[in-house]
Amino acid sequence: MQGLPTIILVGPMGAGKSTIGRLLAAELQREFFDSDHEIEARCGANIAWIFDVEGEAGFRDRETAMLRELASLDAVVLATGGGAVMREDNRQALRERGTVVYLATSVEQQIRRTARDRNRPLLRQGNPEQVLRDLFAKRDPLYRATADLVVRTDRRGPRAVVNEIIRRTKRLSDPLDLKA
């Protein structure tokens, strides 16, 4: 689908950024990139290992470099890591390069979606529910401040979310298009 800008998905772990991003890219006939997967491919190691060896600050440095690179591409769909909005440089780069969509979800939904995932380093730091609640309190305002659109994902299928993103992004791109 021509005419739509790069679409950048932000939101917490378990919001569906990767799943929705892949479907959205296929629907729009665009390339899809997941910044966390790109970091893993480039490093030859998973995120948990990078956190263990370099700490969160080391990972965030890699993430910032990767986001700059991926956000510079034209007309792609980009799924970011949940903590990408923690740095102002990242928020600014994302806002400047495309339409930012916050995939908002409840902590309860996050718990259901991440319960068996062992590759989430931040969830290994104590009670996962409390960690998710603390992350939500810190990050939700940043997601909202960065986003052009907020789309809820709770109790919705990925296809319905994709359709809403396309419809609302078209409306943002051309507010006079009455069919959008």
Swiss-Prot record:
Pfam families to which the protein is assigned, alphabetical: SKI
Gene Ontology biological process: amino acid biosynthetic process; aromatic amino acid family biosynthetic process; chorismate biosynthetic process
Pathway annotation from the record: Metabolic intermediate biosynthesis; chorismate biosynthesis; chorismate from D-erythrose 4-phosphate and phosphoenolpyruvate: step 5/7
GO-annotated molecular function: ATP binding; magnesium ion binding; shikimate kinase activity
Domain of life: Bacteria
Record field: catalytic activity: shikimate + ATP = 3-phosphoshikimate + ADP + H(+)
Swiss-Prot/TrEMBL keywords: Amino-acid biosynthesis, Aromatic amino acid biosynthesis, ATP-binding, Cytoplasm, Kinase, Magnesium, Metal-binding, Nucleotide-binding, Transferase
EC main group: transferase
Membrane-crossing segments per the record: none
Tagged with keyword Disulfide bond: no
Cofactor note: Binds 1 Mg(2+) ion per subunit.
Keyword Nucleotide-binding set for record: yes
Record-level GO cellular component terms: cytosol
Cofactor(s) the protein needs: Mg(2+)
Places the protein is found: Cytoplasm
Residues that coordinate or bind Mg(2+): S18
EC number(s) from the headed UniProt entry: 2.7.1.71
Predominant location: cytoplasm
Annotated binding of ATP, by residue: G14, A15, G16, K17, S18, T19, R120
Family as reported in the entry's similarity comment: Belongs to the shikimate kinase family.
Purpose of the protein: Catalyzes the specific phosphorylation of the 3-hydroxyl group of shikimic acid using ATP as a cosubstrate.
Subunit relationships: Monomer.
Designated name of the protein: Shikimate kinase
Source organism per UniProt: Chromohalobacter salexigens (strain ATCC BAA-138 / DSM 3043 / CIP 106854 / NCIMB 13768 / 1H11)
